[in-house]
Structure formats: structure tokens, C-alpha cells
Regions:
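Secondary-structure boundary elements
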Residues: 133-135, 147-148, 187, 195-203, ...
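C-terminal cap/substrate-recognition subdomain and adjoining C-terminal extension
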Residues: 2-15, 212-347
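Short beta-strand elements
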Residues: 136-151, 157, 171
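Asp-based phosphoryl-transfer active-site loop
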Residues: 151-166, 284
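Short, surface-exposed connector motifs at secondary-structure boundaries
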Residues: 199-207, 263-270
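Short, acidic loop-to-helix structural element flanking the phosphoryl-transfer center
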Residues: 180-204, 214-218, 256
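Short, flexible helix-coil linker/hinge segments at the edges of structured domains or between repeats
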Residues: 161-185
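Intrinsically disordered, serine/threonine/proline
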Residues: 1-141, 145, 334-336, 341-347
Length: 347
């Protein structure tokens, strides 16, 4: 077993001098962890879908406290408000097994492991395992992108593949803390659109990029699977304080994730899928201007009047930024976007 260094990327704000709110959150988590362990809870690992390329893989998982003997499936079914009251385990060692090679990594202050490791895996889907010293072994799917692939899909989640009410506070709280995946509604035609895109572009990676918290990852994964969306990695964030602010910026999370994908896969041109409620047009436009060779097109789902009100209005941008090299398509549903993408030669 080899020891890997902690990633230079700092997804949970583990700076040397954390913000006052982050220090208070750490103390609160430590208090809750001590109480939970007195009740007999032990660590369990919730594994998320990872991705990579020949030579490396990005591993994503989270360590929480659960009853001894709780299976990974049972832990994943914690939903609604309970997912946000679960106790994370920070700074715990996690063993990652990739093709028989084991490495030790460390969870961040939110219990999240987000690390890139060397791996000798061929293109396609693979299974790795993750565990702590006291937990059962958990499996995680990872998708290794073929170096010859030149097309990929990045899709927003809220109001793009799933009808939500974010960010209106009361409805956002209801959707996040109460509803499970059975009560969430898919956007008409979007699952078919993404499935057609993956058939038209074999081997294309699919990334679901959201400002949602890691707590809801199991619920979102079950929703996407139940609605027959293509399998892919979820890139979520931590809603808590960071080393320099009270709350993490969702927009910065999306911008940084897109820039990272452009660096990790310089040969891929991404189809960016989002909606016109708030910031997707602005975020995608900025990325297309900064990385024109990394964008094949931008597909924007147009919200209905009622959805736009619930989402806090439409984008304030005076139309999407028009990069000379980027095609933009707009439609209210997946079928309309598919028709326009077909005309553009992407379907």
C-alpha cells in the first residue's frame, strides 16, 4: 500500500487559518461526532461516481457516522432533512483500492474525499473500493475517458434535468429537506435528449454539475437513475463556511469545475446544458469566451413563466454572450433542444 499526498485542490476550505464560522462549524461537528460515537455510531463511506483518463482517476466519496452494520445502500437512502443532520467525519484516513493498488487519503473537514490518484485503468466503466479502518468496504463506479473521445456533456441539474423551485427559500427548503426522489419531477424530454447524445457520441463523458450540497448526492443519483438519465459523475459542493467567507459560492463552484474539466480533458469539446433562470447563461458564456476550443455548443432550457418566478427570475444578462465560435440553442424542453442540436449536427 502506498501513501498519497493530500490533493492541492481544497474543496472544503481546509486553509491554515479558517474563517471564524468555519472554526465554529468544526467545533460543532466535533461535539456531534463525540455524542454520536457515545451512542455507538461508527464511520461509513458513501461512494460517488468518479471519472478519469488513462493514468489517473478522480475519486469522490464522503465519510459519515452510521449505526454499525448499516449497509452502503441503507446509508444512501438517508434523505430529506436527515441527510443534512448526518454527522460527517473529518480528517479520517480512507483506503482507496484501484485495480488492486491501495492508497491512503484523508477526508476534508466536511468528511469529503475529492482526490486525483494515479491509476492504470483502460477506457470504460470500472469499480473501485473505498473504506475507513472501521467501516465496511464500499464500491464506487468510475468512468475512464478514452483519449480519442472529442465530445462530452456537462448538464446543470436544478430546472434543467429536474423541476425544482430553487432558490426561492421556502420551496428550496421543502425540496431539499423534505422531498425524496419519488416526488421530484423530470424536465420533459431531457432524459431522452441526453440518452440520444450518448448514443450519437459513444464514450462521451457525462458530468452533472450542480450548486447542490454533497448531502443530496444519493437522492440525486437515485433520481437520475430512476428517470433513465445516462450515468455520470455528480459534481456538488459544500454549503458551509470556508476559510474566508460565511458561505461557499455556488457560482465559483461551477466556474472552477468547468475550468478544471477544460484542463483535465483539453481534447474534448463540451456541450453545456443549462436553463435561463439566473446564472447558467452567464457562467457558460464566460467559459465559452475563455475556452472556445472546449465548447461545442450551449443548450439552454427556457423556463415557463411560473418556473421563472419560482426560480427567482430569469438571467439578467441581455441575451447570452455571443461567442463567434459557439452555437447557442434555446427551447422549453428536451425535444425542442434535440431538434435544434440535430440541425447543428450534434445528434
Amino acid at each position: 500500500m502506498t501513501e498519497s499526498r493530500k490533493p492541492s485542490r481544497d474543496p472544503a476550505g481546509t486553509a491554515s487559518i479558517p474563517h471564524f464560522a468555519a472554526r465554529m462549524e468544526d467545533r460543532f461537528h466535533s461535539f456531534r461526532e463525540r455524542r454520536a460515537r457515545k451512542r455507538g455510531l461508527t464511520s461509513t463511506v458513501i461512494a460517488y461516481t468518479g471519472y478519469g483518463a488513462p493514468g489517473w482517476v478522480r475519486v469522490l466519496c464522503r465519510v459519515l457516522l452510521a449505526r454499525p452494520g448499516a449497509t452502503d445502500d441503507r446509508a444512501k437512502k438517508i434523505r430529506g432533512w436527515r441527510s443534512f443532520t448526518s454527522v460527517p467525519v473529518n480528517d479520517v484516513a480512507v483506503t482507496v483500492d484501484i485495480g488492486g493498488t491501495q492508497r491512503r487519503v484523508t477526508a476534508d473537514r466536511g468528511g469529503v474525499v475529492d482526490v486525483v490518484l494515479e491509476a492504470d485503468l483502460p477506457p470504460g466503466w470500472h469499480t473501485i473500493t473505498v473504506r475507513t479502518d472501521e467501516s465496511e468496504t464500499t464500491t464506487a463506479p468510475v468512468f475512464i475517458v478514452d483519449p480519442d473521445v472529442e465530445f462530452g456533456i456537462v448538464s446543470d441539474v436544478d430546472d434543467t434535468v429536474m423541476v425544482t423551485a430553487l432558490p426561492r427559500p421556502l420551496l428550496a427548503a421543502w425540496n431539499t429537506f423534505v422531498l425524496d426522489e419519488h416526488a421530484r419531477r423530470p424536465v420533459p424530454g431531457m432524459a431522452v435528449l441526453l440518452e440520444r447524445l450518448t448514443r450519437s457520441h459513444p464514450g462521451a463523458p457525462v458530468i452533472y454539475l450542480s450548486t447542490g450540497a454533497w448531502n443530496v448526492a444519493p437522492t440525486l443519483t437515485r433520481f437520475l437513475s430512476r428517470q433513465l438519465y445516462p450515468a455520470g459523475a455528480l459534481l456538488l459542493t459544500d454549503w458551509g463556511p470556508t476559510h474566508d467567507r460565511w458561505f461557499r459560492s455556488g457560482l465559483d463552484h461551477k466556474r472552477e469545475s468547468l475550468a478544471r474539466l477544460a484542463t483535465e480533458f483539453p481534447g474534448i469539446r463540451w456541450l453545456l446544458i443549462g436553463d435561463d433562470g439566473q446564472h447558467d447563461e452567464e457562467t457558460y458564456g464566460e467559459f465559452a469566451d475563455a475556452h472556445p476550443d472546449s465548447v461545442s455548443a450551449v443548450a439552454i432550457r427556457q423556463l415557463s413563466g411560473g418556473e421563472a418566478v419560482l426560480a427567482g427570475g430569469r438571467s439578467r444578462a441581455e441575451g447570452p454572450p455571443k461567442s463567434a465560435r459557439t452555437r447557442w440553442v434555446h427551447a422549453p424542453n428536451g425535444a425542442g433542444l434535440a431538434e435544434q442540436l440535430s440541425r447543428a449536427g450534434l445528434l
